[in-house]
Amino acid sequence: MQPDLHCRTLAAHTLKHFRALSPLTHCMTNDVVQTFTANTLLALGASPAMVIDPVEARPFAAIANALLINVGTLTASRADAMRAAVESAYDAKTPWTLDPVAVGALEFRRRFCLDLLSLRPAAIRGNASEILALSGMALGGRGVDTTEAALAALPAAQALARQIDCIVVVTGEIDYVTNGQRTLSIPGGDPLMTRIVGTGCALSAVVAASCALPGAALDNVASACCWMKLAGQVAAERSEGPGSFIPAFLDALYHLDMEAANATN
């Protein structure tokens, strides 16, 4: 099954709908990336909410447009709050996205993520090692870093998407987005995106928010990946290193409506 190249014209069209909806996105993410994730969503036009307390997480997940579960700094108490939020989202039919950070390296989070899969995520976003581990095809990875190329994990992603009936995103130099039947590829980005903390986690939040949009989920999620790749390219051209890349990246996301509309395939 050969991946199709995602159309940037469609990504520009999807971004207009995204900004109009401004999805209220409940982010239960890791401590390292909270601010960057919130700023990424705001720059694109979404409305982030970083609600983590168990007492609040359950009711808030039911009223949000989308929910992100990121296990990067997982603890036992946080796992309880996340499970409560996912159960609430499932009951309310709120789409939720799983970011299984380092799932192949640590047993507690692996068991937790596998347990959550029964509650039907709308999307899963991870690097190649994480997707291979979550699918049961391999364990390992070097913490949050991948030891595999994205293309190597594509069969696992396609099988996982069919098994769970969701969208699976494998990120790398080229991102692959699949529903198990159809696969889209999104090239672009820049190596500087791997030299700062949080671009992958922020992408997971944007993927989660995109799942709140009407229409084809595969195209919406692929568009989210395209926005981030394009912003990374633009930011790299305007920055001198990681320190200046971050504000340039947020600016590129903020102005992306014009840049995406003018981009060619």
UniProtKB/Swiss-Prot annotation:
InterPro entries reported in the protein's UniProt record: Hyethyz_kinase, Ribokinase-like
Enzyme class of the recorded protein, top EC level: transferase
SUPFAM superfamilies the UniProt entry points to: Ribokinase-like (SSF53613)
Catalytic activity: 5-(2-hydroxyethyl)-4-methylthiazole + ATP = 4-methyl-5-(2-phosphooxyethyl)-thiazole + ADP + H(+)
Domain of life: Bacteria
Pathway: Cofactor biosynthesis; thiamine diphosphate biosynthesis; 4-methyl-5-(2-phosphoethyl)-thiazole from 5-(2-hydroxyethyl)-4-methylthiazole: step 1/1
Gene Ontology biological-process entries: thiamine biosynthetic process; thiamine diphosphate biosynthetic process
Pfam families: HK (PF02110)
Chain positions recorded as substrate binding sites: M50, G198
EC number(s) stated in the UniProt entry for this protein: 2.7.1.50
Annotated GO MF terms: ATP binding; hydroxyethylthiazole kinase activity; magnesium ion binding
Annotated residues for binding of ATP: R125, T171
Function: Catalyzes the phosphorylation of the hydroxyl group of 4-methyl-5-beta-hydroxyethylthiazole (THZ).
UniProt family annotation: Belongs to the Thz kinase family.
Protein name, as recorded: Hydroxyethylthiazole kinase
Species per Swiss-Prot/TrEMBL record: Salmonella typhi
